[in-house]
């Protein structure tokens, strides 16, 4: 059994607190079967750990404590798993993927996959829409709830800082944002503005019945803008093209807020590889 990070999402089905959601997730544990889980949230971990004990499940908690020597660079990062003395290369720039990779590695080893084969699988992994660079300095990220946005801003700030250092110029940060109406979009926007401090925010509208109205999004964005330029462009394709065309080489552009947004962009972007340029179709 594998359980990744738990945050407040799908609360209408799973419950209104992290512990309630963890209890629902722990429902997949099976008696005497091992469980590998994200151990970074104490409240969630306690629920999973207790359920594992009740069912006599061998438990493998994974947190940043299990690895050392984290090295970051353009296109990914590497780390050393302490207990296994195994170095992993992770082809994603967001640091939260380090724990995810270690979870995957531990699960593979429990399935009798040898260490080198497991490491090769992680090294060759592809994950569209998670801090995915689709052309130079343009990233898609599917963060769509408060926990996801908190993880996103840390990773995005590091990416933007690295690009500024590499270019030797004070590059700007652009955001393309959209959300669905049943998420805490006000908190998401506040975190983005306060932590990432973008120079420009473009709001767009999703083609789904769950989409947040432009009016509600604009009101929330202007409330927390704090000097950031805010623009509304309802058409996703036009909004994307506007930001990318105005982006200078040293600037960084992030598209975030909803998996619906990432899905719409994925349909409209043609790419031939990770480091290729993308064009709208």
For each feature predicted by the language model, list its residue ranges:
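C-terminal helical cap/extension that packs against the catalytic core
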Residues: 41-56, 60, 189-252
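Acidic, Mg2+-coordinating active-site environments of NTP-dependent enzymes
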Residues: 3-88, 101-116
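Short, flexible loop segments at boundaries between secondary-structure elements
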Residues: 206-210, 275-281
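Nucleotide phosphate-binding/pyrophosphate-handling subdomain across enzymes
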Residues: 2, 6-7, 20, 84-200
């Amino acid at each position: 059994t594998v359980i990744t990070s738990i945050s407040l999402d799908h609360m209408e089905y799973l419950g209104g607190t992290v512990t309630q959601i963890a209890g629902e997730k722990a429902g997949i544990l099976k008696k005497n079967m091992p469980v590998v889980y994200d151990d970074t949230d104490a409240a969630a971990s306690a629920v999973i750990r207790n359920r594992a004990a009740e069912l006599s499940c061998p438990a493998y908690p994974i947190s940043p404590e299990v690895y050392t020597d984290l090295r970051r660079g353009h296109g990914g990062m590497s780390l050393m798993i302490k207990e296994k003395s195994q170095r992993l290369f992770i082809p994603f720039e967001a640091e939260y993927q380090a724990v995810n990779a270690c979870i995957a590695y531990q699960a593979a080893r429990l399935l009798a996959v040898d260490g080198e084969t497991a490491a090769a699988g992680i090294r060759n992994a592809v994950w569209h829409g998670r801090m995915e660079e689709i052309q130079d300095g343009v990233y898609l990220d599917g963060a769509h709830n408060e926990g996801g946005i908190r993880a996103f801003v840390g990773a995005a700030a590091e990416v933007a800082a690295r690009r500024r250092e590499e270019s030797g110029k004070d590059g700007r940060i652009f955001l393309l944002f959209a959300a669905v109406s049943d998420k805490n979009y006000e908190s998401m926007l506040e975190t983005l503005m306060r932590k990432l401090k973008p120079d420009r925010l473009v709001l767009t509208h999703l083609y789904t019945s769950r989409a947040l109205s432009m009016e509600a999004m604009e009101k929330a964005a202007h409330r927390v803008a704090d000097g950031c330029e805010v623009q509304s462009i309802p058409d996703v394709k036009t909004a994307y093209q506007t930001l990318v065309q105005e982006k200078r080489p040293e600037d960084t552009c992030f598209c975030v807020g909803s998996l619906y947004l990432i899905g719409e962009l994925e349909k409209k972007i043609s790419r031939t590889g990770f480091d290729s340029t993308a064009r709208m179709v």
